[in-house]
Regions:
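Extreme N-terminal starter segment of soluble prokaryotic enzymes
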Residues: 2-5
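Active-site HxH/HxHxD metal-binding segment of metal-dependent hydrolases
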Residues: 10-14, 25-28, 35-114, 126-134
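Metallo-beta-lactamase
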Residues: 26, 107, 117-157
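Short hydrophobic/aromatic beta-strand element in the GNAT-like acyltransferase core
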Residues: 17
Length: 157
């Protein structure tokens, strides 16, 4: 078992996304994908991973996500926090607070963190055999030396 946790950073948009998986089980998720999804597909293939779920930490008003393209290319489901239920034009997997996502030797836990947007979630990354988290993927909830702002809620109605 080996945890895969790879960050992709697009400096011009200050956008971080992640490939998280377990090399033994071959199961993986992508969190907050960039518009160009080829890097996730290429890396997953080279690492022997199958992307099963695309997680959006929140609705992104500041860039175009690649979630639909990545789901189409892989057959992955698209997951959002529970407050997103009924707000998309496509099917989503509702990721409720406390839910655990098992990837084999790695697991993820969903934390609802409304504030930046009502459906914002953070993802806590665990590795089997280690009780403490390896990482917390915070979307736009936390920034280095700052916190996320309540974001453009008027765009939701």
């Amino acid at each position: 078992m080996a945890l895969v946790l790879k960050q992709y950073y697009l400096a011009c948009l200050s956008h971080a996304s992640y490939l998280v998986g377990d090399s033994a089980s071959g199961r993986a998720v992508v969190v907050d994908p960039q518009r160009d999804v080829s890097q996730y597909l290429d890396d997953a293939k080279s690492l022997g991973l199958s992307i099963e779920l695309v997680i959006e930490s929140h609705f992104h008003a500041d860039f175009l996500s690649g979630h639909l393209e990545l789901a189409a290319a892989t057959g992955a489901r698209i997951g959002y926090g529970a407050a997103a239920k009924g707000l998309t034009d496509f099917d989503i997997e509702v990721l409720e607070d406390g839910r655990r996502i098992d990837l084999g030797g790695a697991s993820l836990q969903v934390l609802e963190t409304p504030g930046h947007t009502p459906e914002s979630i953070c993802i806590v990354v665990y590795e089997r055999g280690r009780p403490e988290p390896r990482a917390v993927l915070t979307g736009d909830t936390l920034f280095i030396g700052d916190v996320g702002r309540p974001d453009l809620l008027s765009s939701f109605g």
